[in-house]
């Protein structure tokens, strides 16, 4: 599978089987994450691979609490909820119910002290630091796609960071920024993604000027 096919079919896969992922596959996926570019090549991230059943159950309980809060508005819409959002919610419910059976959850950690955060003083939320972590997250997810392993990027456990850090013995000043459930898909899992056309996302030279490379 080439990288373009992997990117074009990288759906969020929340319905995951408990079957173990072979060690060579896991090693290739984590190697891909470690290859990611980071600011100054400092690599200010670490990954905690969670496989312990008790820890997975605890993470699942924490995640389910936040998922219920996140989806409360959608549930209130009942039959009026749009079908794509209903499907997403149902898949998320499945993930919550089976979190303790997952073969692997990857917790991405970062150390802001090792980042050159060039937008820290701007009058808006800072995002530059994430550029030295989420590149690794995307590499990991693309590698998982290439290996046929399902996964989904989640961040709700950031609301439970203190409990997660205690559970996994993550020291200060490290924080968490992504939690990736992984496993082989229950159903087809991957397939063509649905996104805005690039013509709606790309400008040339000035804002809202349509790009024309002809």
What residues fall within each predicted segment?
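Short catalytic-loop micro-motif centered on adjacent basic/acidic residues
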Residues: 15-16, 46, 150-154
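C-terminal helix-cap and adjacent tail motif
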Residues: 5-6, 13, 177-214
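Small-aliphatic-rich amphipathic alpha-helix that forms the alpha element of a beta-alpha
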Residues: 28-29, 33, 106-108, 112-167
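Short connector loops at helix/strand junctions that flank enzyme active sites
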Residues: 42-44, 99-103, 175
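Glycine-rich phosphate/pyrophosphate-binding beta-alpha loops
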Residues: 34-41
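A glycine-rich helix N-cap at a beta->alpha junction
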Residues: 68-78, 167-192
């Amino acid at each position: 599978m080439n990288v373009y096919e992997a990117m074009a079919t990288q759906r969020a896969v929340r319905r995951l089987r408990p079957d173990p992922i072979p060690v060579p596959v896991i090693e290739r996926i984590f190697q891909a994450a470690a290859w990611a570019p980071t600011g100054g090549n400092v690599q200010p991230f670490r990954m905690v691979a969670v496989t312990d059943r008790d820890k997975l159950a605890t993470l699942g309980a924490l995640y389910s609490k936040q998922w219920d809060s996140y989806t409360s508005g959608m549930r209130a819409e009942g039959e009026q909820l749009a079908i794509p959002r209903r499907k997403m919610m149902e898949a998320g419910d499945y993930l919550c119910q089976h979190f303790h059976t997952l073969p692997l959850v990857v917790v991405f950690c970062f150390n802001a002290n090792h980042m050159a955060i060039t937008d820290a003083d701007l009058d808006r939320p800072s995002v530059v630091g994430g550029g030295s972590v989420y590149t690794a997250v995307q590499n990991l997810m693309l590698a998982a796609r290439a290996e046929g392993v399902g996964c989904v990027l989640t961040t709700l456990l950031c609301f439970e960071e203190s409990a997660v850090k205690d559970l996994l013995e993550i020291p200060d000043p490290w924080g968490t920024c992504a939690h990736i459930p992984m496993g082989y898909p229950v159903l087809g899992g991957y397939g063509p993604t649905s996104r805005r056309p690039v013509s709606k996302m790309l400008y040339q030279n000035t804002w809202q000027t349509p790009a024309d490379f002809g």
